UniProtKB/Swiss-Prot annotation:
Gene3D superfamilies in the record: 3.40.1350.10
InterPro entries reported for this sequence: Restrct_endonuc-II-like, tRNA_endonuc-like_dom_sf, UPF0102_YraN-like
Annotated family: Belongs to the UPF0102 family.
Pfam families in alphabetical order: UPF0102
This protein's name: UPF0102 protein SRU_1822
Length: 122
């Protein structure tokens, strides 16, 4: 039986492959700043903007839609980590956005939903 970590890791791999296939450059995985983490840091090739991605994976619908589990506290943590990444890479003020990739693993082919500009930075 797959553990929660296994399911999450598989979802992140699927999300990264999906984004790569859509023209995103994957810059970092599981980037940590302080105690905050961003699952994927990307750069959209066409627009040149940084994209901070939260991946939510579910193996069933018992806990609701994956994207519905991103709380205000989680959004704040993602924003903190994103600011840290931009600072560390000398990119403060660069165009950036927050996306969510929801992955459903229900036994058949994975279902992937990509929500661009899923929320705004405070």
């Amino acid at each position: 039986m797959a553990t929660t970590n296994d399911i999450g890791d598989r979802g992140e791999e699927i999300a990264a492959a999906h984004l790569d296939g859509a023209g995103y450059e994957i810059l970092a995985r599981n980037y940590r700043h302080s105690r905050n983490e961003v699952d994927l840091v990307c750069r959209e090739t066409d627009a040149g903007e940084y994209v901070f991605v939260e991946v939510k994976t579910r193996s069933g619908t018992g806990f609701g839609a994956p994207e519905a589990s991103i709380t205000a506290k989680k959004r704040a943590a993602l924003q903190h980590a994103a600011r840290g990444y931009l600072h560390e890479h000398g990119a403060e003020g660069a165009p950036a956005r927050f996306d969510v990739v929801a992955v459903m693993l229900t036994g058949g082919p994975p279902e992937v939903q990509h929500y661009e500009n899923a929320f705004w930075a405070d």
